[in-house]
């Protein structure tokens, strides 16, 4: 992605025309699905968030094309600041979260419909939904100046030939979030380069993403730490168990059995009334 040079002598950026709805229609909850969908593509600044949030609240998959159209209407206007209509549409697509929404976000990125701060929102949504993006675009995004975009792009990465070397470089990124996202992506690919960062992360700040990535490598030290995580973070017990069960390793089976036994003891203890 190439950054546009800022013209210090340029006038204010043009703003696309919008067609505000009559104020009495702004009760979005009162609109039918069809009325809501019809209103979204032409929504102005005043009503875009209200309409998009309502579509998200309803998990309205039928609104995906309308939300995408709202984003496309504002192509070219977000180089220096977030376009409210695009932000509203992207947030709604991420909340709706269906396959069509995932594809729509990927298509918006491929077509260059979002840029600047809006691209940050779009790539984060793509990572959240697993939007399909080609290797060439992910490779460019991994080199982006914005660390938030680099981190989100790492979460979108697949084991392509040109991607892994860039992710290995990003392990030493100055921004911790980027390095951790790169380590998780490499771990999912089974790359040994991610082993040490994932060991540190399991000790210092485990999460679902880190556990899943560690399972991609699954050596004995990582397996032991995945098991210990359940005593430090009981809320991650289910994630750790599921990850261990994917590993064809006798130690993983042993650790999983130990975790289940501890769960059974805790459950029994809770059922016994205090004297």
Please report, for each region that a protein language model flagged, where it lies by residue.
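Initiator methionine at the very start of the polypeptide chain
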Residues: 1-2, 275
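Structural detector for internal amphipathic alpha-helices that build alpha-solenoid repeat scaffolds
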Residues: 9-28, 38, 42-61, 69, ...
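Short linear clamp-binding motif
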Residues: 2-10
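Functionally critical, cavity-lining and gating residues within the transmembrane helices
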Residues: 102
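Terminal, low-structured helical/coil segments at or just beyond the last alpha-helical repeat
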Residues: 253-275
